[in-house]
């Protein structure tokens, strides 16, 4: 049995007893589900007659020794404003309504009731009867809002729910849907608020700004329309529970009960299934199950159910300028006003006077909080409010750029206990008539004077109403947005990033922070520090923060707790990440210490995007192990598997990677080759090539560039003239090495005769288009000064690994006169011979028999053309590529250029160019004539000439066309179709052309030293069906037991006992039958030594077919050697499988 207890204490309060005991009040109490009313009348003259019926009981008495028992049994207490009664009731945790007796002297009860109400403990009112009852029926004041003091008559005040008193004031459970609408008992009582209100003082702002100034045109028009009606739209969290949040706020003065309201709605619809089932398509039970999910939105069917539950009719404002829609018309006096947008979102609609009253209440509450809880001096609060209102300047760009509010969020370092600064806040609730100074921003000259955060000052101001519920939701939403980003012009912008903003065309740039992303992802809301303003600006007006040093953007940020790297979405990191680091991290990155490796990638200038993630490598600093993150493979793999685990002898001077471990694992899980570069005697620099990135040993205190990547993403060494690259748009990657001594990496031994060091340029020299003189020169400043004349200060000798012997070097000289990789331009370079050496550690090669080779320029080398006709081949002087059905063997040379012998039997291939400083060696004996070729097909159009110097031709070939540039657009718009897979393989194909400028067919002379090897198996040649469709090659597969024998004896088992023939061996070119034909002017070519040091050279088996579109490489990626790579492609399967 639910009970209401009314007490007046020891005095008399006849007005209260008369109001409560009136017949209409008793009927109202009974209709609300209360079955008993207990009156403690004291010394009053009004004594109601007690009675008892089956449904209701009235008990009356004057005094008792103690009221604790009645208070404990009561579900609601209505009391006079005596201090003892109030405190005793609140101690029991009961909902309390205090009625003030205005006939007492000095009205001391009002002061006590005001203070307790400010602290949120109770509600209070008076018993005055209104002279204008018509105000009670006004729907302008939101029902259920005790704070609205304008017209809280019996009808309006009937919205006060007893469950509200229990849940809102004392955090008790909400009243169930069985008795949802408990109204106040006494019709003649009038709600009273302590501060008198002046209507002219609180004129609201026309067209309240939406949160972050991102209102749509329809929302702005709706706000203007509601303002003309004396209403305003209070924003509700934009989630699936917006309808239940709005109803909870209008019923219970808080949005925290939206989940209970949702559950009550589901329960009511389940109990009254016959009423609602006809409106639902499909299973009604499943519909209710989905409705119970907080992520499921609700509509008009739920509004009808809620109207029946809470005895409210719903009025919806849907279109600006049009009258509202009555969604329900059940005849209820109480109304709930909502605003419905086209996106299905619901907001609450209140009167402007409610907004004014709520602003005063909020200011009083925050004042009590800071004075009594945080013990802040009252004068300090007043000073802060005055400074908040007057200490700012006019917002000059408010109307143009959409500056959302007048104030900024300064965080005080000594206010950690206070709430954080709001990153984005709404000012839709600012009254029109309040101090115009608040439209201005705080003076940037001395912003540190603000003692409190902006949100606190906003809530302390009684003239501003802060939408706390919406602020809380917005903050939580922004936490989720931190993992998201938006992309513009190839650059990704994250919430909270620091940037520079231009407010006017060709105006100055201001430092700012990104606060919010626009609805259409074409604009952002930024907070400008200098102006202390928020502005909505297009993405075109943003640019990254300019660094003082030429410091590039880091590819990844290391995790503080772990040893790995954090995954960055999309593989790109904004350049402003560096600015967000603390001082220790910046010092650790920018300070170069001898022996440490610093990984960095120079970004494009003027906001251009970085290289795609597949061409970048992760940086590391500190003690984190260098690792590379593969976005395609989705895992992180270190190169420790391919290098010794013991430290280097000079590890004490640096803690980076081992000196000889500059390679990472590529996409096929194989280490790439290292290209050794010799700038001079006793000096060696390494550049490692793989499918991810190109890295070169960097210099110390020097500005000579060793390896560069121009902005077309084409790779090569710079000419050896000491000239620096111009422009930050050239993407460069370095890592630092320390100087060594002459014994760390000795010069290559000369076993067969004198060898000459070729001048220091690259076999892969790339003609680069000259930059305009207007571009700045790359300048990496270091603390210890710079080097004069761009020379190296130190001997770049790298200490050999203890368990690794110095491998042999395969050297070749390639002319760079006709190599032009620039897009749409030809490059003229001096015909200078260059040397590039591939260095393969002998231990990494496993148990592979190496063969030394020596090539002369007068020996004809067959070349496969990649011209337009796919089935044609270019015949050389004496050998045709179509004749290379089986490998041809010639006698080894007896004289000529000496071969450098090394423990790993290096192979040398030299093709001197005219004008080279090396004397031409004597030619070796010519190879035996090959078998007669098949009848050639009709001649194709003249293909581009091969790169062999000794080849002559009477026809003038057309100039070579440049290959297409690298794909660098992160959105993939420069690709044919695919944006992820195709971009990688497209660039990989181009890399193959840039990387493999070798002859299509080369010969390998037999070693002077007889090796203990077994014979190779003989494979039968499949019949040639069609030259346009090359057949699959066979390959030697590793079998169980055979590989172990081979690794132990340095031999390779064969199927027969026939010896390997002596002489030069001609290797065919492996073609890709599924690749596209390359551009004319570039021959598919093949290195003698494989690109991957862990895989041995393949023995020639099968036929080389002319006109192949692409080549695979030197070897098949089969499981040979010390690691097991990925299986070969489906179109390249050995015939023996």
Swiss-Prot record:
EC number, as in UniProt: 2.4.1.141
UniProt-reported outcome of changing residue 17 to N: Decreased N-acetylglucosaminyldiphosphodolichol N-acetylglucosaminyltransferase activity
Protein name: UDP-N-acetylglucosamine transferase subunit ALG13
Described function: Catalytic subunit of the UDP-N-acetylglucosamine transferase complex that operates in the biosynthetic pathway of dolichol-linked oligosaccharides, the glycan precursors employed in protein asparagine (N)-glycosylation. The assembly of dolichol-linked oligosaccharides begins on the cytosolic side of the endoplasmic reticulum membrane and finishes in its lumen. The sequential addition of sugars to dolichol pyrophosphate produces dolichol-linked oligosaccharides containing fourteen sugars, including two GlcNAcs, nine mannoses and three glucoses.
Species: Homo sapiens (Human)
Catalytic site positions: 239, 242, 345
Domain OTU: from-to ranges: 231-352
UniProt domain Tudor: residue ranges: 492-552
PANTHER family: BIFUNCTIONAL UDP-N-ACETYLGLUCOSAMINE TRANSFERASE AND DEUBIQUITINASE ALG13-RELATED, GLYCOSYL TRANSFERASE-RELATED
This protein's GO CC annotations: cytoplasmic side of endoplasmic reticulum membrane; endoplasmic reticulum membrane; UDP-N-acetylglucosamine transferase complex
BP GO terms, sorted: dolichol-linked oligosaccharide biosynthetic process; protein N-linked glycosylation; proteolysis
Biased composition range(s): Pro residues: 918-946, 956-967
Disease field: Developmental and epileptic encephalopathy 36: A form of epileptic encephalopathy, a heterogeneous group of severe early-onset epilepsies characterized by refractory seizures, neurodevelopmental impairment, and poor prognosis. Development is normal prior to seizure onset, after which cognitive and motor delays become apparent. Some DEE36 patients may present with an abnormal isoelectric focusing of serum transferrin, consistent with a diagnostic classification of congenital disorder of glycosylation type I.
């Amino acid at each position: 049995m639910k009970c209401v207890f009314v007490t007046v204490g020891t005095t008399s309060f006849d007005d209260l007893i008369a109001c409560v005991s009136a017949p209409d009040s008793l009927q109202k109490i009974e209709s609300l589900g209360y079955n008993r009313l207990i009156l403690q009348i004291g010394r009053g003259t009004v004594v109601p007659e007690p009675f008892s019926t089956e449904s209701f009981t009235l008990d009356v008495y004057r005094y008792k020794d103690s009221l604790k028992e009645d208070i404990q049994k009561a579900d609601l207490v209505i009391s006079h404003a005596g201090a003892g009664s109030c405190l005793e009731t609140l101690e029991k945790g009961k909902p309390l309504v205090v009625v003030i007796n205005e006939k007492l002297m000095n009205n001391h009860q009002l002061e006590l009731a005001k203070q307790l109400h400010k602290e949120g403990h109770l509600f209070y009112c008076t018993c005055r009867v209104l002279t204008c009852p018509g105000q009670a029926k006004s729907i302008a004041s939101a029902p259920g809002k005790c704070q609205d003091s304008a017209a809280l008559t019996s009808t309006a005040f009937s919205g006060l729910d007893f469950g509200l008193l229990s849940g809102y004031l004392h955090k008790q459970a909400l009243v169930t849907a069985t008795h949802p609408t408990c109204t106040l008992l006494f019709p003649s009582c009038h709600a009273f608020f302590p501060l008198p209100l002046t209507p002219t003082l609180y004129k609201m702002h026309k067209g309240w700004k939406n949160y972050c100034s991102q209102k749509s045109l329809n929302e702005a028009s709706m706000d203007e329309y509601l303002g003309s009606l004396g209403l305003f739209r209070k924003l509700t969290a934009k989630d699936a529970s917006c309808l239940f949040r709005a109803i909870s706020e209008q019923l219970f003065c808080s949005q925290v009960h939206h989940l209970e309201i949702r559950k009550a709605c589901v329960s009511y619809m389940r109990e009254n299934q016959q009423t609602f089932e006809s409106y639902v398509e499909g299973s009604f039970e499943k519909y209710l199950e989905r409705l119970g999910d907080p992520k499921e939105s609700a509509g008009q069917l739920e509004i009808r159910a809620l109207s029946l539950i809470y005895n409210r009719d719903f009025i919806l404002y849907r279109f600006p300028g049009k009258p509202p829609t009555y969604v329900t018309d059940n005849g209820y006096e109480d109304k709930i006003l909502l605003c419905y947008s086209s996106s299905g979102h619901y907001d609450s609609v209140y009167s402007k006077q409610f907004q004014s009253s709520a602003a005063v209440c909020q200011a009083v509450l925050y004042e009590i909080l800071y004075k009594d809880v945080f013990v802040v001096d009252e004068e300090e609060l007043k000073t802060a409010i005055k400074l908040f209102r007057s200490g700012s300047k006019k917002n000059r760009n408010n109307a143009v750029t959409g500056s959302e509010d007048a104030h900024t969020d300064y965080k005080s370092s000594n206010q950690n206990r206070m709430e954080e600064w709001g990153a984005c806040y709404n000012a839709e609730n600012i009254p029109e008539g309040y101090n115009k100074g608040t439209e201005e921003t705080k003076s940037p000259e001395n912003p540190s004077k603000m003692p409190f955060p902006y949100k606190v000052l906003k809530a302390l101001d009684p003239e501003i109403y802060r939408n706390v519920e919406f602020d809380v939701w917005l903050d939580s939403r922004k936490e989720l947005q931190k993992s998201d980003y938006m992309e513009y012009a190839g650059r990704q912008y994250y919430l909270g990033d620091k940037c520079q903003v231009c407010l006017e065309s060709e105006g100055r740039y201001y430092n700012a922070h990104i606060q919010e992303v626009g609805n259409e992802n074409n604009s952002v809301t930024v907070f400008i520090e200098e102006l202390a303003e928020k502005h909505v600006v297009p993405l075109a007006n943003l640019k990254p923060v300019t660094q003082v040093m030429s410091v590039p953007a880091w590819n990844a940020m290391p995790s503080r707790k772990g040893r790995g790297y954090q995954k960055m979405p999309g593989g790109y990191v904004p350049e402003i990440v560096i600015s967000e680091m603390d001082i220790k991290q910046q010092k650790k990155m920018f300070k170069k210490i001898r022996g440490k490796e610093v990984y960095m990638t120079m970004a494009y200038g003027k906001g251009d995007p970085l290289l795609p993630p597949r061409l970048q490598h992760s940086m590391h600093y500190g003690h984190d192990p260098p690792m590379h993150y593969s976005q395609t493979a989705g895992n992180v793999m270190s190169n420790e598997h391919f290098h010794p685990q013991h430290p280097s002898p000079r590890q004490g001077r640096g803690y980076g990677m081992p000196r000889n471990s500059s390679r990472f694992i590529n996409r096929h899980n194989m280490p790439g080759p290292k290209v050794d570069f010799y700038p001079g005697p006793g000096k060696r620099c390494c550049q490692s090539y793989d499918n991810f990135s190109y890295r070169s040993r960097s210099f110390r205190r020097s500005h000579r560039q060793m390896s560069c990547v121009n902005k077309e993403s084409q790779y090569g060494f710079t000419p050896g003239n000491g000239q620096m690259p111009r422009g930050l748009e050239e993407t460069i990657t370095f890592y630092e090495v320390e100087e060594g001594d002459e014994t760390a990496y000795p010069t290559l031994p000369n076993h067969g005769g004198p060898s000459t060091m070729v001048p220091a340029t690259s076999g892969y020299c790339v003609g680069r288009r000259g930059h305009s003189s207007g571009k700045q020169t790359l300048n990496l400043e270091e603390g210890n000064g710079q080097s004069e004349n761009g020379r190296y200060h130190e001997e770049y000798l790298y200490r050999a690994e203890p368990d690794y012997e110095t491998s042999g070097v395969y050297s070749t000289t390639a002319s760079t006169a006709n190599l032009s990789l620039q897009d749409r331009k030809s490059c003229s370079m001096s015909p200078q011979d260059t040397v590039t050496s591939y260095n393969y550690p002998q231990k990494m090669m496993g148990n592979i028999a190496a063969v030394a080779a020596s090539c002369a320029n007068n020996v004809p080398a067959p070349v496969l053309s990649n011209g337009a006709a796919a089935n044609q081949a270019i015949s050389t002087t004496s050998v045709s590529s179509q004749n290379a059905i089986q490998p041809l063997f010639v006698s080894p040379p007896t004289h000529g250029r000496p071969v450098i012998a090394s423990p790993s039997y290096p192979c040398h291939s030299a093709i001197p160019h005219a004008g080279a400083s090396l004397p031409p060696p004597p030619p070796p004996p010519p190879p035996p004539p090959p078998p007669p070729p098949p009848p050639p097909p009709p001649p194709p159009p003249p293909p581009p000439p091969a790169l062999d110097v000794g080849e002559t031709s009477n026809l003038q070939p057309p100039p070579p066309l440049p290959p297409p540039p690298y794909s660098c657009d992160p959105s993939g718009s420069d690709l044919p179709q695919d944006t992820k897979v195709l971009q990688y393989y497209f660039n990989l194909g181009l890399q193959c052309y840039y990387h493999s400028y070798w002859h299509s067919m080369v010969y390998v002379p037999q070693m002077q030293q007889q090796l203990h090897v077994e014979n190779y198996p003989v494979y039968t040649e499949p019949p040639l069906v069609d030259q346009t469709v090359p057949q699959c090659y066979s390959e030697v597969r590793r079998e169980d037991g055979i590989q172990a024998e081979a690794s132990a004896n340095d031999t390779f088992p064969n199927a027969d006992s026939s010896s390997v023939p002596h002489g030069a061996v001609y290797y065919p070119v492996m073609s890709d039958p599924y690749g596209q034909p390359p551009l004319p002017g570039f021959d598919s070519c093949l290195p003698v030594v494989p690109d991957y040091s862990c895989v041995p050279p393949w023995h020639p088996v099968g036929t080389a077919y002319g006109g192949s579109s692409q080549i695979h490489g030197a070897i098949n990626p089969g499981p040979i050697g010390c690691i097991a790579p990925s299986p070969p492609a489906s179109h390249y399967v050995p015939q023996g499988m």
